[in-house]
Amino acid sequence: MSTVLVFGHKNPDTDTITSALAYAELKKKLGMDAEAVRLGEVNGETQYALDHFRVKAPRLIESVKGEAEEVILVDHNEFQQSADGIEDVRILEVIDHHRIANFQTADPLYYRAEPVGCTATILLKLYKEHGVEIAADMAGLMLSAIISDSLLFKSPTCTDEDIKAAKELAEIAGVDAETYGLEMLKAGADLSQKTIEELISLDAKEFAMGDYRVEIAQVNTVDANDVLNRKAEVEAAIANTVAAKNLDLFVFAITNILTNDSEAIVVGPKPELFEQAFNVTLQNGLATLPGVVSRKKQIVPFLTEAATK
């Protein structure tokens, strides 16, 4: 039997990388020949977590074609966010906490989706359900995922289940969640060495919304001006992406982890979708979104509603 690859979405974030590692570890303990892989570069926040808990990043692959016959998806399900060649392999399982869209399979599968803030919260349940002890390093990585997705428990996506899971994982990992979490988020918020192309692709996801193709990228920072001072360059790079992918809209959210607000740079032929979704008027392609920190809960649903009216 060939190795089953376990991976998250393209432009991987901390939940995608660490959940792939943690779930592959669980599947191996249950007797499956599983390997965690990644579909993109590791960002600064995730690298901080990997270094802290002394775990190597998963192997990078460009496509699943020729790599595996069977795969497991974590932290995503939409095919446009998944590996190239995903249509040509058998999906055995999906473990996710996002909406279900643009997803179909030829065979039955195990699909676990829960309305929680992080895939790692679901993985903790799976470890318990199978009676498998979580190693300290895996617990630390899973904690890192919850901290990342919840912005240290401040995001509206964060549930009581996520907070409870984080406390349990922090105890196993031997760290203080608040202290460790703030340092990890700060590591991810350092954008000083990032190129413009890296900024707009670090955490970018493409969505099918009605008849429209929309990409939403997000970066965390402690000062939005670190990005806004380069706005013209950012807009030019986004325009190239819009043209190359034939997108209708590209939203680049710059989220301040200290104030919990976002600035949005909007580019594309359908800016009115954004204006309708958030009841704002763009000023030179820019809008302030007070209290908005979550792409999943505070951006995607409103844009989807506007796009399907």
Curated annotation (Swiss-Prot):
Statement: the UniProt record of this protein carries the keyword Hydrolase: yes
CC cofactor note: Binds 2 manganese ions per subunit.
GO cellular component: cytoplasm
One Pfam match: DHH
Cleaved signal peptide residues: none
Example GO molecular function: manganese ion binding
Classification via InterPro entries: DDH_dom, DHH_sf, DHHA2, DHHA2_dom_sf, Mn-dep_inorganic_PyrPase
Residues annotated for Mn(2+) 1 binding in this entry: 9, 13, 75
Entry binding sites for Mn(2+) 2: 15, 75, 97, 149
Catalytic activity: diphosphate + H2O = 2 phosphate + H(+)
EC number: 3.6.1.1
Keywords of the record: Cytoplasm, Hydrolase, Manganese, Metal-binding
Tree of life domain: Bacteria
Localization: Cytoplasm
Cofactor dependence: Mn(2+)
Family: Belongs to the PPase class C family.
HAMAP family found in the cross-reference section: PPase_C
Full protein name: Probable manganese-dependent inorganic pyrophosphatase
Natural source organism: Exiguobacterium sp. (strain ATCC BAA-1283 / AT1b)
